[in-house]
Amino acid sequence: MDSPAAIATRNITAFLWFRVLFNSRFYYPIYTILFLDFGLSLEEFATLNMVWAASIVLFEVPSGALADKLGRKHLVVFSAWLMVVEMLLLCFMPIGAGPLTFAMFLVNRIVSGMAEACCSGADEALVYDAIPAAGRDAAWTRVLARLMRWQSLTFMIVALIGAAVYSQDFMNRLPGFTGLSKETCMRIPLWLNLGMAFATLAVSLRFIDTHPRSTERASLGALTRASFAQMLATGRWILRSPAAVVLILTGLLYDSFTRLFYTIGSNYYRLLGIDESYNGLILAGGAAIGIGTALVVEKLVGVLKPSHNLGMVAALIFAGLLGIAHQITAWNGWAGVLFVVPFWLAMRSLHYFLSQYLNKVSDSSHRATVLSFKGLTMNLAYGLVMMFYGMQTAWLRHGHESELAPLGKQETDEKLLSLAMSWWPWIFAALAALLVIFVRLRYRRGLTGLIAQNAAPSHAGT
């Protein structure tokens, strides 16, 4: 039998490879245009993203009960099998088949959400529990630091390859690849990701589960109800904690608008006139900036007040939304890419600040479920934003019907995005202002004061 140290080393290695393979998707740099090029409308694309977010929310809580009933390793392996099914659906997806294409995408998004929910937390728990108790926290911090480096590097490589092979112009310039059709190039990133899915499955089998399964005879339904009850109890605790309420509401607003851009990003680059082969270069640049941002925000937590830090994030998001709304196409479209930088800075900063401040205001008995609750509500908010984006697009399509009539599908998609983006900075600004007014009227103080009040018993000297 392996020693505890050997099991810990094996699980750490499996965890690093599992996360890298599971999250490195060759189609991310061309995510939006992939769906649109398969023949979907923008409204259908928005609906599918809403369904994906909803499936994560619905399956997240039952997945905890499944982990307790079946074992964490089995849940991680199941999530890897779901990834294989998810990618097979994409690989054999018919192009432009109308309702059939949408139906297969719908199943794909539900399976993808289930896979995300099943491995969420279970893979981390397999590693954390296997690390010897002495020095566990320090060892876990080192594991997360290694994971960040691995993921940043692989994300850059995968983004560059995925965008390049999707571009018909790029592929046809390569020796031995001339004459490839657009349809063939569209499927290359998907076949590459199918290979990643099988590699993910192989790695998932390497985990060793050191956590004993529940010996209770409770049914899966009873365990699921208990999980939902625990989440509702956490929600009630959050409502009694003003600082936690404000932090989560702020996170929901900021995260949903940032993810809205991340979702439609590849269509924005197409609108600027940038070839798909450069999308990977853009995302790789974003990943590099994200690494540098992590070093800066760590210092900002100790220098600036919480309200100033999150106010800075709001300013970044507004600047990004305002910039993309103007669709500046100078320098062959690259001037417009400059306004994407605020989103990269905002995303990395936001989640670091939220993690720091929520940990500060949450007691140890609620900390884990508060962070889980934050993740669930963020996915729910993202789903709602995508629903409203779909409704906005449908309304714009109806209102500009005569203007859109002579345009082809790609030109129509670009025009609708152009019209929609002009609204976003002002909607975000209005919602942010309403949030500030609500906090001031409801709690009679700002975020910094609420955090200081909440953390006062354990941070009296600060």
Language-model features, listed with the residues they occupy:
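C-terminal ends and interior cores of transmembrane alpha-helices
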Residues: 81-99, 105, 315-331
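Juxtamembrane intracellular "pre-TM" segments in multi-pass secondary transporters
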Residues: 1-9, 207-249, 457-462
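Juxtamembrane helix-start motifs in multi-pass secondary transporters
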Residues: 72-78, 189, 306-313
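A membrane-interface helix-boundary motif in multi-pass transporters
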Residues: 166-195, 393-433
